């Protein structure tokens, strides 16, 4: 369902909803009152009206949470939201591809031991200098990754090396994606007046990618977008932000001949506030496109996964973000305020997190993906 309306500031506000749990109107029901009732809102009455897009989807699996690993679905449900916030342009992009390995067409993408052929792909891309690179990643990254994984399987690599295979595939995928973006910059046609389109050289994007399978979760991060797993009520970060003042990143930038300058925050060459990204042709080799990859085995304590751009994480801690998502997914908000809050879907959780970020003063675009890994017990009550 697609709707277009007007926000409180007169800007166009586009809402896109994809149903799965019957929560198609989730984004429209989000208001400051909901956040205040959860005791987590700040005083910003316009916060909830800046939603640009919402997506929600789910599987039909409603089985008990007390299951063995082999019967876990890769993903019970998911929801996402992208909010333009106080920026003039939306530069973020979100990608969600259920059972994305099927995109290889011949089944070769299914990895032995890596989820028994069912892997879901989720990603948040935080663009800067424009949306060109983030959009390119949204369209291509999952395709490139499926190709890289399939290639490794066809080479006959051992199933026992699953973690290494995933890391290699992620590294190769990010390198290919960066190569495609940089190549498009180099091949860009000159303007009508004959000058070079130098603006393309200053466009880039962070990327946090999660592949969720039945047995493991693989996260690759390049930049300061972040992935956080809620495991047994504890917020477990699955990525580490690439900030220019991070000691190892500072050392890497300087070793490449660059400098980190404190200019309204630490920035590479005084320009970019992240030390790794895809694109940013003009800052290479100081800014790297190589991701850090983490592979974690799933447990029966895993509840949900949050991926988000720094528009959320700059103002909301990992712990608070997980608390809000948990309140939505376990149905607590709906049971307390059934007349105004549905509060039991991943889309509700993503929308509330984005609203909280705006109400707390985030000045960036905000994109959030919430992936429900199992039904929380109180939800069925």
From Swiss-Prot:
It catalyses: O-phospho-L-seryl-[protein] + H2O = L-seryl-[protein] + phosphate; O-phospho-L-threonyl-[protein] + H2O = L-threonyl-[protein] + phosphate. Its EC number is 3.1.3.16. PROSITE patterns: PPM_1, PPM_2. GO terms for molecular function: metal ion binding; protein serine/threonine phosphatase activity. Induction: Induced by abscisic acid (ABA). Keywords: Abscisic acid signaling pathway, Hydrolase, Magnesium, Manganese, Metal-binding, Nucleus, Protein phosphatase. Binds 2 magnesium or manganese ions per subunit. Mn(2+) 2 binds at residues 126, 310, 364. GO terms for biological process: abscisic acid-activated signaling pathway; negative regulation of abscisic acid-activated signaling pathway; positive regulation of seed germination; regulation of intracellular signal transduction. Predominantly expressed in the embryo of mature seed. It comes from the Eukaryota. InterPro entries: PP2C, PP2C_BS, PPM-type-like_dom_sf, PPM-type_phosphatase-like_dom. Interacts with ABI5 and PYL5. Binding to PYL5 is dependent on the presence of abscisic acid (ABA). Belongs to the PP2C family. This is Protein phosphatase 2C 51. The lineage of its organism: Eukaryota, Viridiplantae, Streptophyta, Embryophyta, Tracheophyta. The gene is PP2C51.
């Amino acid at each position: 369902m697609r709707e277009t309306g007007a926000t409180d500031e007169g800007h166009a506000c586009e809402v896109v909803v994809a149903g799965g749990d019957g929560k198609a109107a989730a984004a429209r029901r989000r208001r400051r009152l909901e956040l205040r009732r959860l005791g987590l809102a700040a005083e910003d009455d316009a916060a909830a009206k800046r939603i640009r897009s919402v997506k929600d989807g789910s599987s039909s699996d409603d089985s008990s949470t007390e299951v063995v690993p082999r019967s876990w679905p890769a993903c019970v449900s998911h929801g996402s939201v992208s909010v333009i916030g106080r920026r003039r342009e939306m530069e973020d992009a979100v990608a969600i591809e259920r059972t994305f390995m099927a995109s290889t067409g011949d089944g070769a993408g299914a990895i032995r031991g890596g989820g028994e052929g069912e892997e879901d792909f989720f990603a948040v891309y935080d663009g800067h200098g424009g949306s060109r690179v983030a959009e390119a990643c949204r369209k291509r990254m999952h395709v490139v990754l499926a190709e890289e994984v399939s290639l490794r399987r066809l080479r006959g690599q051992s199933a026992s090396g699953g973690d290494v295979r995933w890391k290699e595939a992620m590294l190769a995928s990010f390198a290919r994606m960066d190569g495609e973006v940089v190549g498009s910059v180099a091949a860009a046609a000159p303007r009508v007046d004959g000058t070079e389109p130098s603006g393309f050289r200053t466009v880039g994007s962070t990327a946090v990618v999660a592949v969720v399978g039945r047995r493991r979760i693989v996260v690759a991060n390049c930049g300061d977008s972040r992935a956080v797993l809620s495991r047994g009520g504890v917020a477990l970060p699955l990525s580490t932000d690439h900030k220019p003042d991070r000691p190892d990143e500072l050392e890497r930038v300087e070793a490449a001949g660059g400098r980190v300058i404190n200019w309204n925050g630490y920035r590479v060459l005084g320009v970019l506030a992240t030390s790794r990204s895809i694109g940013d042709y003009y800052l290479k080799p100081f800014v790297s496109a190589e991701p850090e990859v983490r592979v974690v085995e799933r447990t029966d304590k895993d509840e949900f996964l949050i991926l988000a751009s720094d528009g959320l994480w700059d103002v909301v801690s990992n712990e608070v973000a997980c608390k809000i998502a948990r309140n939505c997914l376990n149905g607590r908000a709906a049971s307390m305020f059934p007349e105004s809050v549905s509060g039991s879907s991943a889309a509700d959780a993503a929308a509330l997190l984005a609203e909280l970020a705006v109400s707390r003063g985030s000045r960036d675009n905000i994109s959030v993906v919430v992936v429900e890994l199992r039904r929380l017990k109180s939800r069925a009550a």
